């Protein structure tokens, strides 16, 4: 049997691609080395931020706005436990922060609903937050957070119900190209398709060693908090930059635990066994202390944490391109720790590729050729 599309890696982007391509009427095979959602990639830990006024550059804004529409659609499948929670996101940092300047520029260019507050305004609205006098806050009312594992579980279930074939707990060991299309090799045998999408995340270089992707071990942790820090008390999700440039992100508390992580830093790794569990690196439990001590002093001790991986490109922008020399294989990789919010739209882009549809987006900034 020859599929229209084989998806290699069915975590964030792959789960979305499987659903959107199957819904479009294609004969699709989703594959994964594990059983998604799982703990081996970049999607576990329950929640991920979604920000619209994008500090990483305005080129992402059209993508994230379409992503939001798709997240809203997906949330309707889980109305009791919605996948998207519109908590708002407060971006905190020094008034001269480059990241915040990019947030403001993105908001202005795309007429997004962003409110600017000075230090006193921030602390008046959220008394739990402490910032220096030279800090500002850019509050995105319409942003919030996503339930990442629930999203993947929902896409996989919807794809299966729509007739998608799924081969999980079965690593792809090689990809071959010939005049008839693409063949993947697995322990379960070989499978053929007209087209393939490679969104294998952290260990994509096991299949395609020439790709400029560097895995980095990252951690996030949950700290003791109370109802003041919850969505019910209108406490927002947040990003925060310290005076030394370190970037943090976090979420409203749930079940008396507030989740926070540090975006920069981490440990460069070269194999899966180097991604040791949380607390096996001495700094894991204390990584968020500088932010908590200065910005959220009412938060208590570390309760538990988890390790994940970023698949970093050299410039930390995404790689969305066909495999050089093989126009029937699309790469979506190098998401560099800020990709989950885009999973819905990237899955749709992958489904369009499989149908030979031209993308609605300018993907030029994400081409591999920028590294040559």
Curated annotation (Swiss-Prot):
Among InterPro entries, the record links this protein to: FAD-dep_OxRdtase, FAD/NAD-bd_sf, Me_Trp_Oxase_MTOX, MTOX
Q: Which family does it belong to?
A: Belongs to the MSOX/MTOX family. MTOX subfamily.
The function of this protein is: Catalyzes the oxidative demethylation of N-methyl-L-tryptophan.
The organism encoding this protein is Escherichia coli O17:K52:H18 (strain UMN026 / ExPEC)
Q: Which GO terms describe its cellular component?
A: cytosol
- Binding positions for FAD? 4-34
Q: Which cofactors does this protein require? A: FAD
Q: Which residues carry this modification: S-8alpha-FAD cysteine?
A: 308
> Subunit structure of this entry?
Monomer.
Per the record's keyword annotation, is Flavoprotein included, yes or no?
A: yes
Identification of the protein by name = N-methyl-L-tryptophan oxidase
Where in the chain are disulfide-linked cysteines found? none
> What keywords are assigned to this protein?
FAD, Flavoprotein, Oxidoreductase
Co-factor remark: Binds 1 FAD per subunit.
Catalytic activity from the UniProt record: N(alpha)-methyl-L-tryptophan + O2 + H2O = L-tryptophan + formaldehyde + H2O2
| Highest taxon listed in the record's lineage | Bacteria
SUPFAM superfamilies, alphabetized = FAD-linked reductases, C-terminal domain, FAD/NAD(P)-binding domain
A molecular function (GO) held by this record is:
flavin adenine dinucleotide binding
The family database entries (NCBIfam families) matched by this protein are listed as: PRK11259.1
Would the keyword Oxidoreductase turn up in this protein's UniProt record?
yes
What's the Enzyme Commission number for this chain? 1.5.3.-
Q: What class of enzyme is it?
A: oxidoreductase
Q: Which gene encodes it?
A: solA
């Amino acid at each position: 049997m020859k599929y229209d599309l084989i998806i290699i890696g069915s975590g964030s982007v792959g789960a979305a691609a499987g659903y959107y391509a199957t819904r479009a009427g294609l004969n699709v095979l989703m594959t994964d080395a594990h059983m998604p959602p799982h703990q081996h990639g970049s999607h576990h830990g329950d929640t991920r931020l979604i920000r619209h006024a994008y500090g990483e550059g305005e080129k992402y804004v059209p993508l994230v706005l379409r992503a939001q529409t798709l997240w809203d659609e997906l949330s309707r499948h889980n109305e009791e436990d919605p996948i998207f929670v519109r908590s708002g996101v407060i971006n905190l940092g020094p008034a001269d922060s480059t990241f915040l300047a990019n947030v403001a520029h993105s908001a202005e260019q795309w007429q997004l609903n962003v409110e600017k507050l000075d230090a006193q305004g921030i602390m008046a609205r959220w008394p739990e937050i402490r910032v220096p006098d030279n800090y500002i806050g850019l509050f995105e009312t319409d942003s919030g957070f996503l339930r990442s594992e629930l999203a993947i579980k929902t896409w996989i279930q919807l794809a299966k119900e729509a007739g998608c074939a799924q081969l999980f707990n079965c690593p792809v060991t090689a990809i071959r190209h010939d005049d008839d299309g693409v063949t993947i090799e697995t322990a379960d045998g070989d499978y053929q398709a007209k087209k393939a999408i490679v969104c294998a995340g952290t260990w994509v270089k096991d299949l395609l060693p020439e790709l400029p992707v560097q895995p980095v071990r990252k951690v996030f942790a949950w700290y003791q908090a109370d109802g003041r820090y919850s969505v019910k008390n209108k406490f927002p999700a947040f990003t925060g930059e310290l005076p030394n440039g370190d970037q943090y992100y976090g979420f409203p508390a749930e079940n008396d635990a507030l989740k926070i992580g540090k975006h920069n830093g981490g440990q460069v790794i070269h194999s899966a066994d180097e991604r040791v569990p949380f607390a096996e690196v001495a700094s894991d439990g204390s990584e968020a202390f500088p932010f908590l001590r200065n910005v959220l002093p009412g938060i208590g001790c570390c309760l538990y944490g988890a390790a994940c991986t970023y698949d970093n490109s050299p410039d930390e922008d995404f790689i969305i391109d066909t495999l050089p020399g093989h126009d029937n294989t699309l790469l979506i990789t190098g998401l560099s720790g800020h990709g989950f919010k885009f999973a819905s739209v990237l899955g749709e882009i992958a489904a369009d590729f499989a149908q030979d549809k031209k993308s609605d987006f300018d993907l030029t900034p994400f081409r591999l050729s920028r590294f040559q």
